[in-house]
Amino acid sequence: MAPVEDGGGVEFPVGMKVLVVDDDPTCLAVLKRMLLECRYDATTCSQATRALTMLRENRRGFDVIISDVHMPDMDGFRLLELVGLEMDLPVIMMSADSRTDIVMKGIKHGACDYLIKPVRMEELKNIWQHVIRKKFNENKEHEHSGSLDDTDRTRPTNNDNEYASSANDGAEGSWKSQKKKRDKDDDDGELESGDPSSTSKKPRVVWSVELHQQFVNAVNHLGIDKAVPKKILELMNVPGLTRENVASHLQKFRLYLKRIAQHHAGIANPFCPPASSGKVGSLGGLDFQALAASGQIPPQALAALQDELLGRPTNSLVLPGRDQSSLRLAAVKGNKPHGEREIAFGQPIYKCQNNAYGAFPQSSPAVGGMPSFSAWPNNKLGMADSTGTLGGMSNSQNSNIVLHELQQQPDAMLSGTLHSLDVKPSGIVMPSQSLNTFSASEGLSPNQNTLMIPAQSSGFLAAMPPSMKHEPVLATSQPSSSLLGGIDLVNQASTSQPLISAHGGGNLSGLVNRNPNVVPSQGISTFHTPNNPYLVSPNSMGVGSKQPPGVLKTENSDALNHSYGYLGGSNPPMDSGLLSSQSKNTQFGLLGQDDITGSWSPLPNVDSYGNTVGLSHPGSSSSSFQSSNVALGKLPDQGRGKNHGFVGKGTCIPSRFAVDEIESPTNNLSHSIGSSGDIMSPDIFGFSGQM
C-alpha cells in the first residue's frame, strides 16, 4: 500500500519514531540500519530497564517499540505488559525462538506482531500499519466520547432521564468490544486523510483493587438503579479517570450482578421445601382456616396441622398456652355407626427439652362455642424418662409432648393436684373430678400404655409410689351405696359406659371381665361382696380381701394371668410368693408383674383380718372400699397408636393413639338380666371384649 500524505505534504511513514530494545549489540546495529533505510527515526537500547525509563520520561517520544523476548535484566513479556499499561503504545516482539507457544504467549500479552530473527526488510516496511490502526481507533473513541459529552449537556437533570445514560453506556461498551477485535485483526483497512501523529493519546486505565473499591462505594452510595457514570465520577474524584472509563466499568459491574442473581435464583433451597398445597378443613366442628385468619392459631401451627393431617411427621407444632388461645377439640359424643373411626392427631402440641419444667395455664377461653378445656394446676411436671417424654405421649419420632389442656366436662372435672408424674412412653395420666384426698407424695409411675383414672371423691391416699407396668388400668365404678358381687357381671364389647348403681344377687362367682377397653372414673362409696371366690380375667386387676397372708387364694382354681394387682393396706413382701395359695393374711399391696417400685403405706381403717380395707385422708371426708373381689379392667395390648383415652361419659381426649379404634354406641344403657342371672347388656361397666 502506498504511503499516505498528510495535509502538509509530508509522506507517512517517513519520520515514524521507533524504539528498538535488544541485548545483542550486533542485532541492534543491523535493525537500526534497516529502519533508516525505511526512512524511520530509529532509537536503540541494550537494556530493558533503560528503555522503560526512557519511555516514562518521554511518553510522546516514540510511536512504536520493537523488543526482544529474551533479555537478561527483564523479560520481554514483562516489558510488554508495563508499556501496555502505562504508555498504551504498540509493541512488536522479535525472537529467534519460533515455537508456537512462545508466539502465542506474546500475542496474549498484547503484542501487535511477532517477528522471527533474522528480521526481513519487508516486515520492517509494514510496521507502520500497527501505528495507523492504533491511532485510528483512538480517533473514533475520542469522537464517540465527544458526542456523549454533548448529550450530557443537553440532557435534563431529572431522575427519570438519568437512566438514558446507562443505555448509552451499553452502546459504548459494545463498541469497545468490537474495537478490541479490530485491534487484533492484521488485515489492512482504509486509511483516512490527516496526520495520525497529531491526534492525542489516552492512557489505558487499570482498575486496581483500590480503584474498584472506590467505584463500588460510589455505586452503593448512589444506589445501583440511580448510579450513572457522571455522578460516580464525581464521587470517586480520581485524577485521570474519564467518564468513558467509568461507564464501561459500570456496565461490566451490572452484568456481573445480573449473573449472580440468576445463579442464585436457579438454585433450589434444600432447607426450605415448597409449602404444602393441602388444605385443612374442619375437624370436630372447628374450622382451622377461620381460626388462623382470626389470629387465634399461629400460621406455623396451621402449617404443622396440615402436615399432620396429610400424613407427614411434624416436630415443630407449638401452641403456647399463656398468651394465645389454645386449640381445642370438641367432645365426641353420641352413637357412632359401625366402621366410623375416631380422627385424632397427636403431633407435639408443646415441645420441651428433656427434664424441663413447665407451668400450665390456669384457664383458657373457649373457641367457637365449643367446650373449653380446664387447665392443669400450676404445678411442675418432673421428667424421669430416658426418652424425654413429657406429660404423657411419645410419638414415633420420640418427640417431647405436653398435654397443655384437657377438656372440661361435668362428669370429669380436672381439678386434682399431681405433684410429680413419671410418665413412660404412650402413657396418659388424667386426674378425675373432686380429687379431694388423692395424694401422691412421691408421684405415680405409669408405664407403657397406662391409663390411670382415680375415682371421683374416692378418698384415695397413696403415700409411696406404686409401679404399674405392662398396660394396667386402675379405675373405680360409678357412685353406688353397695355393690354385692352375687351375680356374674358379663360384659361384651363395651366402651366407656358408666357402671350401674347397684346390683344384688346370690353368692355367685363375682365380677367377670375380659379384654376391657376403658373403665370410666365416677367415684365409688362401698364395694361389698361375700367371701365367695371370684373370677379375674387375663387382663384384669383385683382387690383381695380375707385371704391368707401374702397370697391370692382362688378356691375355684381361677387362673390369674399376668398384668394384675391388688389394693390392700401395708407393704407386701416383694417376691413371687405373693401369687401362690398359702395361709392367711389380710393386708396386700399393689403389685406389678415385673417389679415393685413402691408400696402403699398402712391405712388407718384396716382391721387385723382384712374385713375392711378403708382408704381415708386426715381432714377430709372420704369413702372406703369394704371387702374386695373388685375386678379392675386392663387395656388390651394393641400396640402403639391403638388405645383410646376416655374421661367421664363418652368424653374423648384426642391423642396420637386414637386412630384405629371403633367406638361402640354409648347411649343405650339397658340393664336387662337374662334367665341365668347374667346381665345381657353389652354396654355395662365399660368393659370391652367377648366372653
UniProtKB/Swiss-Prot annotation:
InterPro entries: ARR-like, CheY-like_superfamily, Homeodomain-like_sf, Myb_dom, Myb_dom_plants, Response_reg_B-typ_pln, SANT/Myb, Sig_transdc_resp-reg_receiver
Region (Disordered): 139-204, 616-647
Keywords: Activator, Cytokinin signaling pathway, DNA-binding, Nucleus, Phosphoprotein, Transcription, Transcription regulation, Two-component regulatory system
The keyword Phosphoprotein belongs to this UniProt entry's keyword annotation: yes
Segments of skewed composition (Low complexity): 616-628
Coiled-coil regions listed in the entry: none
Gene Ontology biological-process annotations: cytokinin-activated signaling pathway; phosphorelay signal transduction system
SMART domains xrefs: REC
Residue numbers of 4-aspartylphosphate PTMs: 68
Described purpose of this protein according to its UniProt entry: Transcriptional activator that binds specific DNA sequence. Functions as a response regulator involved in His-to-Asp phosphorelay signal transduction system. Phosphorylation of the Asp residue in the receiver domain activates the ability of the protein to promote the transcription of target genes. May directly activate some type-A response regulators in response to cytokinins.
Stated name of the protein: Two-component response regulator ORR21
Gene source species: Oryza sativa subsp. indica (Rice)
Phylogenetic lineage: Eukaryota, Viridiplantae, Streptophyta, Embryophyta, Tracheophyta
